[in-house]
């Protein structure tokens, strides 16, 4: 009986991930399939794994794209997205940043504090998600990704996937980065979830949110 309930929950979780990918695509948000925790049934005896990829000691288990060419693969085409999750129903959902949106990424505690501050001041934050890694993601209007490098302005907060672990406080995911979207999951953490659901409304400018988020990070013990 217990095993039947667990199987039902796993099937429902898988369905929610595919449905979420379709919903993001309908908003015009490019997505691509992500690695996922393989689960006990997929772990050979004596060889525990926390990620579906073949990499030994994966540094970001369940939190990276399936394809190394994710920047070229990502799409908002509903038919393509449906095919991906039909072929890979367990896949997490990866959202590339720097296209439709950027993401301001802070520790969850700082994010909740910042949301309270924004509510008091009347500042609307736009979509906000909690990640399985105990981070809060604030989705904002993208700074863009111009083809001409001379038109690109960098920021000391810019965060690339391979540098995420080096930055404990405020991170700005823009071009060449990505985030794990709800309801994706990792091996030892709860599913990601939305605190403020995405809607078909214009995303907010990120600059007004920066000061509030930076202050919140400082209040909870982070200097960035």
Please identify what each model-predicted range represents.
Residues 1-133, 142-144, 186, 199-203, ...:
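Signature for HUH/AEP ssDNA processing cores
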Residues 138:
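Catalytic core of tubulin tyrosine ligase-like
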Residues 142-224:
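DNA replication initiation modules
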């Amino acid at each position: 009986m217990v095993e039947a309930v667990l199987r039902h929950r796993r099937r429902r979780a898988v369905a929610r991930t595919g449905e979420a990918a379709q919903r993001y695509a309908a908003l015009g948000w490019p997505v691509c399939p992500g690695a996922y925790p393989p689960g006990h049934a997929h772990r050979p005896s004596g060889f525990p794994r926390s990620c579906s990829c073949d990499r030994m000691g994966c540094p970001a288990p369940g939190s990276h794209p399936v394809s190394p060419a994710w920047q070229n693969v990502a799409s908002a085409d509903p038919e393509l997205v449906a095919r991906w999750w039909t072929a890979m129903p367990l896949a997490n959902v990866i959202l590339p940043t720097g296209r439709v949106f950027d993401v301001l990424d802070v520790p969850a505690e700082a994010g909740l504090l910042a949301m309270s501050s924004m509510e008091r001041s009347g500042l609307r934050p736009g979509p906000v998600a909690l990640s399985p890694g105990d981070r809060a993601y604030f989705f904002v209007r993208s700074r863009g990704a111009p083809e001409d490098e001379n038109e690109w302005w960098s920021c000391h907060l810019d965060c690339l996937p391979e540098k995420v672990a080096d930055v404990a406080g405020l991170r700005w995911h823009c071009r060449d980065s990505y985030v794990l979207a709800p309801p994706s999951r990792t091996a030892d953490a709860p599913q990601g979830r939305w605190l403020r659901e995405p809607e078909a409304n214009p995303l907010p400018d990120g600059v007004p949110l920066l000061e509030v988020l930076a202050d919140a990070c400082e209040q909870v013990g982070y200097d960035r």
